[in-house]
């Protein structure tokens, strides 16, 4: 163990650093410090709210009040024409990526996984798509693009009649690696 720790120090940092090198720990410290500054927090919350308000203006169903890191699209209201067992939130997330190159994540039936005994899907009350906004990365012009893309998808939502079927899934935590096929 002692001989191996020498190499650990050279390649990953000190053995008590949890596998993080000094550069990464420094970046983490900067991020933690920034996240306590009022101006940063105000700017961050305003950017998320900017996107949320645009979506509300366009009639796109979102969860309110807006948070400080993400906007949550309400897939049950966005695409009610897609049956729940065809993963409507996942279908919406895929459509957003295909149409606009915008990545979101399904927070719904896929994430809720199957009942461990019956292996049937568990259907949560909410079917959401989370649009997490990375910090210090995007401008309000990017947020306007996201909003316009979602408006276009929402305006053509009546064309969405079917969703997806899972063709491969892990026995637990399927949402990380499941594979889907369009119905």
Spans of model-derived segments:
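Active-site C-terminal subdomain of aminotransferase-like
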Residues: 1-89, 94
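Flexible glycine/proline-rich, aromatic-decorated loop/lid segments
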Residues: 1-6, 19-23, 98-126
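PLP-dependent enzyme catalytic core of the Aspartate aminotransferase-like
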Residues: 35, 99, 111-183
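Acidic/polar loop patches that form or flank catalytic/metal-binding clefts of enzymes
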Residues: 40-41, 62-64, 102-107, 160-161
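Active-site lining segments that contact anionic ligands and/or coordinate catalytic metals
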Residues: 66-70, 91-93, 99-102, 125-130
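Glycine-rich beta-alpha junction loops
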Residues: 68-69, 77, 110-112, 137
């Amino acid at each position: 163990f002692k001989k191996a720790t020498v190499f650990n120090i050279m390649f990953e940092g000190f053995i008590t650093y949890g596998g993080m090198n000094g550069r990464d720990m420094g970046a983490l410290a900067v991020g933690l410090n920034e996240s306590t500054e009022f101006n940063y927090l105000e700017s961050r919350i305003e950017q998320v709210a900017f996107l949320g308000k645009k979506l509300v203006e366009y009639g796109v169903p979102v969860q309110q009040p807006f948070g400080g890191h993400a906007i949550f699209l309400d897939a049950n209201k966005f695409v009610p024409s897609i049956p729940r067992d065809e993963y409507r939130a996942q279908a919406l997330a895929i459509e957003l990526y295909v149409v606009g190159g915008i990545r979101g994540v399904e927070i719904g039936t896929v994430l809720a996984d199957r009942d461990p005994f019956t292996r049937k899907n568990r259907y949560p009350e909410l079917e959401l798509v989370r649009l997490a906004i990375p910090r210090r990365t995007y401008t309000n012009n990017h947020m306007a693009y996201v909003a316009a893309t979602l408006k276009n998808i929402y305006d053509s939502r009546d064309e969405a009649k079917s969703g997806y079927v899972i063709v491969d899934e892990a026995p637990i935590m399927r949402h990380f690696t499941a594979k889907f096929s369009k119905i």
